[in-house]
């Protein structure tokens, strides 16, 4: 954790080794979430303009993860993303957009592959 003040964990949350939470903004996990090894959750957004970046300007966008979500190894979740309940996020995925509930998603960028029960 970068700060620890902006993290909310639901019941039965499990994170494997080397989980990184860059929590300048709120990161919320629902119940029964499984996080595989080497996953990263980042809320900080830095400007593309070099002068603003050099001046230390940044904003934070929250990350929200529903209940019953499983993250495979090495997933990166970017600022401002919401992941719905009952999702599976495949190993090595880079999640840059919201993922709807009850879906399996994977890739870089991460995209929905199918419904969970298909």
What are the language-model segments listed below?
Residues 1-82, 108-118:
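Flexible, glycine/small-residue-enriched loop-and-beta-strand segment within the central core
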Residues 34, 70, 88, 94, ...:
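Short-chain dehydrogenase/reductase
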Residues 84-87, 100-102:
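Conserved catalytic segment of ABC-fold P-loop ATPases
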Residues 92-93, 98-100, 109-110, 116-117:
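Short glycine-rich donor-binding/catalytic loop of glycosyltransferases
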């Amino acid at each position: 954790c970068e700060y620890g003040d902006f993290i909310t964990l639901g019941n039965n949350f499990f994170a494997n080794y080397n989980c990184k939470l860059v929590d300048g903004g709120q990161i919320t996990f629902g119940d029964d979430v499984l996080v595989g090894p080497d996953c990263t959750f980042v809320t900080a957004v830095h400007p593309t303009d070099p002068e603003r970046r050099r001046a230390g300007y940044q904003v934070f966008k929250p990350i929200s993860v529903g209940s019953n979500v499983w993250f495979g190894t090495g997933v990166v979740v970017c600022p401002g993303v919401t992941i719905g309940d009952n999702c599976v996020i495949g190993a090595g995925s880079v999640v840059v957009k919201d993922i709807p509930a009850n879906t399996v998603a994977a890739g870089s960028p991460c995209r929905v592959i199918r419904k969970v029960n298909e």
